[in-house]
Amino acid sequence: MLLTASIILLSCNNSIYPTNGETIYRTGKNLRGEKLLDKKASRIKIVNNCKTCHGKQGDAMKNVSIKFSDLSNPNNGSVAYTDSLFYRFLDHDLKSDGSKANIGVIWKMNDRDKKDLLEYLKKL
């Protein structure tokens, strides 16, 4: 009975997605329900997740695609992102060339959450 109730509740909750990475991208929370946006450190306060600016498929904003296939493409006019450069971006708001991103959105993610988000972006 308890298992059935849990399954029903989870299936009704539209903020849970198949993977932790997709959940982070679409909701700004991990599967543990932790909010990952550091609103105190962020200049932009109205954003709660990646999808808000980047859209459902990661490419809603012109020249700001976060599909990893675009980020890691050396022909995009900037230094291609590697996994470690992407993690540095999340941790320090630095673009792939080392300059300040100045996006104003700061995330608090543990290593597992960062890896899961990157794996999701690689599938977009």
Q: Language-model segments: which ranges?
A:
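Intrinsically disordered, low-complexity repeat segments enriched in small/polar residues
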Residues: 7-11, 98, 117
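Gly/Gly-Pro-rich "capping" loops immediately C-terminal to redox-active cysteine motifs
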Residues: 34-85, 106-108
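C-type cytochrome heme c attachment motif
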Residues: 23-30, 44-56, 85-91, 115-119
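Bacterial Sec-dependent N-terminal signal peptides
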Residues: 1-15
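Substrate-binding/catalytic groove segments of enzymes
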Residues: 32, 60-62, 94-101
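C-terminal capping alpha-helices of c-type cytochrome domains
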Residues: 83-96, 105-124
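Electrostatic cytochrome c docking/interface patches
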Residues: 12-46
